Structure formats: C-alpha cells, structure tokens
Regions:
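Glycine- and acidic-residue-rich phosphate-binding/metal-coordinating active-site segment common to enzymes
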Residues: 156-194
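N-terminal entry segment of metal-dependent catalytic domains or homologous docking segments
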Residues: 1-71, 150
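Short beta-strand-to-coil "C-cap" segments at the C-terminal boundary of structured domains/repeats
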Residues: 22, 133-134, 155-157, 264-271
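Catalytic core of PPM/PP2C metal-dependent serine/threonine phosphatase domains
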Residues: 80-157, 184-206
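C-terminal catalytic subdomain
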Residues: 190-342
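Short glycine- and acidic-rich boundary segments immediately preceding or forming the N-terminal edge
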Residues: 1-26, 98-119, 137-138, 165-181, ...
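Helix-loop-helix
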Residues: 50-95, 230-250
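Short hydrophobic beta-strand that contains or immediately precedes a catalytic carboxylate
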Residues: 32-36, 145-147, 211-213
Length: 342
C-alpha cells in the first residue's frame, strides 16, 4: 500500500515537486521521496513554460531533483543491483549524490555571481529526502538519503513515528524549529557545494510504514508529536487508502503555511483495515496528550505544555536519529557516508 499527498499554498505556484513512489516487484526494491524547492533562496525566475507561466529556480529545482532520483533508481534496477545493505559494496551508496551533482552541474552558471544578490541566493535550490528500501518476508532494509530539512521516518504500531534523518540546519532541535526558522547548512543547488547524507538502517521488523515529508507537514504544528497525531487521526477515521490521502490533504491544507508533500508506503500489512487497527492504540495515547493542550493564547501555559509533551515524546521519536554531523564534515561538504562535492 502506498500513497502520495501534494498541496500548494498558491494555486499553480507550488514549489514542492510531486512526491516520488516507485516499487520494483521482481526485486522488492523501492524508493520514495519528497523535494521542496526553496522559494526564498530560489525566487529568481528560471524560465517560462509554454503557457507563459513564470517558473522560479525553486520550482525547477525540486522537479529536477525528483527526476534525478527517479532516474538514479531506474538505473540501479536496470543494472540489476538488487540492493541490500549487508551485501552491497559501499561505493554504490554514492550514486544518488553523484547523479544529482551531474545533473545540476549541467545548468551551473558560467559567469560570476553578482554581489547584489547576496550570500543567501542560490541557483536551483531544493531539499531532498528519500528512502531506498528492500522489503523481505519479515523485515525491511532501508537507507535514508537527504540534503536539507525535509525528513524521512518510520512508523510502527508499537514505537510510533521515529525520525530517520537529522536536519541540515543551524539548530537541528525539532522543538525549537517550530518557534524559529534556523538557516539550512546544506541543500542541493547548481552553484554551491552540497552533499547527500546517507544513513543505512538494518532490519526494521514488519509491519511498518516508511514515509518522507516536506516541512509543510511537520513545520506548522504545536509539538513534534502533532505530526504523528495528524497521520494517525486521519488514518483512524478513513475507510480506505484513497480516503486517508484525501483526509491528509484537507487536514494539512487547514494548518500549513507552505506547500506540503508526503510519500508513504505501508509494508507488512495485509489490508488497510489491519493497518488502521494496528495503529488505533498508538493514536489513543497520542490523542490523550493532545487533548490536554491549553488555550494557545496563554503563552506561558502553552510553553510549559509543549516542553512536557516533547519530554514524553522525544525518546521514542529520536531512537533511530542519526548522530550530528562533525563540523569538519559539514564544512567540507561531505560525510563519512557519502563523499564528494559539487
């Protein structure tokens, strides 16, 4: 079972690309991903389409990154690389970053950048968050691949939502990010160095849900746990997969201040009813916590409630979180998992 959600804040101007969901049945390999074109850094007009609509650098960048990720995965399948983190050679892991760098380098400006635009401006800036996986009879092996502050997660009936990526940002703490907007320290672009971080995950028991989301979903809620509450609240009220997608779409549109996209695949559940029933107890626990939220107009009470809610939620949420990047790795534009620069 799989679904994608895509909404745009301004009709016709959405800078998130469509979510990516691909599964190759013969090898049981798949990839899902989201791509958030960064409208602030990439607000310059890149081109006009056949209807005369202006498209920004951010709009073009997210679509390019999606295309690059799709073609990278298709190339892996065409080469019959049945991927498994326990057996595959480490150099395979560099392919997505190299693929993105090759594509974006093809549109890198050749002239000197004007001093007027400032250091914040980027040519074709976008985030990438993807999960590459191989499903097996009783577990799934996956790796997270990302640049920027879009996120990848795993959701299980027992442990709930757990982050598989750590934002490339000045302040990676997910609670503080809800009240401030830290600067990103890494993003895909055509005119600056970037890296795609890789984090392999061994056997994750089935059943589970793998998902990727842009910050339009998780960046406009009261606490980090509210995103999981949105996921499970809509799930438990849905009759089937299409209904769940529709409820997610309408719910995120009601609270977000940004474009929002999500890609999700449920593995090991025989039916939608089994998925919904499996998450019912977890949702009941989350709902009890959410129902205790004070009036948001009471700033002090709200601050204390948020801190307490995060204290309860944090251990499970961060149980699989990768360690922070070393400062020298960040400054050099590479990690121990994926080397190279643009």
């Amino acid at each position: 079972m799989a679904l994608g959600v895509w909404t745009e804040r301004r009709p016709g101007q959405g800078e998130d690309a469509d979510p990516l969901l691909l599964h190759h049945r013969p090898t049981r390999c798949g990839v899902l991903g989201v791509f958030d074109g960064l409208g602030g850094a990439g607000s310059s007009i890149a081109w006009h389409d056949a209807d005369g609509n202006a498209r920004t650098d951010a709009w073009v960048a997210s679509r390019m990154a999606r295309l690059a990720t799709e073609s990278w995965f298709a190339g892996e399948i065409d080469d019959r690389r049945a991927w498994d983190s326990e057996t595959q050679a480490p150099d395979i892991y560099t392919d997505l970053g190299a693929h993105l760098r090759q594509l974006f380098a093809g549109v890198r400006p050749t002239g000197r950048r004007s001093k007027v635009v400032g250091t914040m401006r980027r040519r074709l800036p976008t985030t990438v968050a993807a999960l590459r996986y191989t499903a097996r009879d009783s577990d799934v092996v996956c790796e997270a691949l990302w640049a920027g502050d879009s996120r990848a997660y795993v959701l299980t009936p027992d442990a709930g939502l757990q982050a598989l990526t750590r934002d490339h940002a000045d302040d990676p703490d997910v609670l503080s990010q809800l009240v401030q907007d830290p600067q990103m320290t890494n993003m895909v672009s055509a005119d600056r160095e970037f890296f795609v971080q890789r984090q392999p995950y061994g056997r994750i028991p089935l059943p589970c849900v793998l998902l990727c989301a842009t910050d339009g979903f998780f960046g406009y809620v009261q606490t980090p746990g509210d995103f999981e509450h949105v996921l499970l609240n809509t799930l438990c009220r849905s009759t089937d997969l299409d209904d769940w997608a529709a409820r997610l779409t309408s719910t995120v549109a009601s609270y977000t201040g940004d474009d929002a996209s999500l890609a999700l695949v449920a593995l090991g559940f025989r039916t939608f009813d089994e998925l919904r029933a499996g998450c019912a107890e977890r949702f009941a626990w989350l709902d009890r916590d959410a129902s205790a939220m004070p009036d948001p107009r009471g700033a002090e009470a709200m601050r204390h409630w948020r801190a307490r809610a995060w204290e309860r939620y944090r251990p499970g949420y961060e149980a699989r979180l990768p360690p922070p990047l070393a400062s020298d790795a960040r400054s050099q534009g590479r990690t121990r998992d994926e080397g190279g620069t643009a």
